[in-house]
Amino acid sequence: MIQMQTNLDVADNSGARRVMCIKVLGGSKRKYASIGDVIVVSIKEAIPRGRVKKGDVMKAVVVRTAKDIRRPDGSVIRFDTNAAVLIDNKKEPIGTRIFGPVPRELRAKNHMKIISLAPEVL
C-alpha cells in the first residue's frame, strides 16, 4: 500500500536508487497504490552518470510492497521492501534490467515488458 510521501527503492538500472511517491494516478480521490499501479515519483537519490538525476519527476510502476497481497486461491504474498520500476510515457521501463523478484499480478495489469526483464516471477 503506497501513498503520497512513501519512499521506495528502485528495482531497475535507470540510475535512481530511492524515489518518493508524490501522486497516485487513477482518479482524483485515489489514496493508495498497490502492485501494478502507476504512480508519479520524485527522484531522491541517484547514481552519477545514470539516465535520471536527483530531482527529476517521473512515472513508476509499483512492483513490490511490504503490504501483503491476497491471491484468488487464498495464498498471500508480501515483500520486505517497497520497490518501483521507472517508466516512460509509453509505459516502457527506462532501465534495461530489473532487479529482484516481481509478482504475477503485473501480468494482469499489462506490464509484460517488466515481467520479461525480471529474473524471477512469483
From Swiss-Prot:
Signal peptide: none annotated. GO terms for molecular function: large ribosomal subunit rRNA binding; structural constituent of ribosome. Keywords: Ribonucleoprotein, Ribosomal protein, RNA-binding, rRNA-binding. One of its GO terms (biological process) is translation. Part of the 50S ribosomal subunit. Forms a cluster with proteins L3 and L19. In the 70S ribosome, L14 and L19 interact and together make contacts with the 16S rRNA in bridges B5 and B8. Binds to 23S rRNA. Forms part of two intersubunit bridges in the 70S ribosome. InterPro entries: Ribosomal_uL14 (IPR000218), Ribosomal_uL14_bac-type (IPR005745), Ribosomal_uL14_CS (IPR019972), Ribosomal_uL14_sf (IPR036853). The keyword Ribonucleoprotein applies. One of its GO terms (cellular component) is cytosolic large ribosomal subunit. This is Large ribosomal subunit protein uL14. Belongs to the universal ribosomal protein uL14 family.
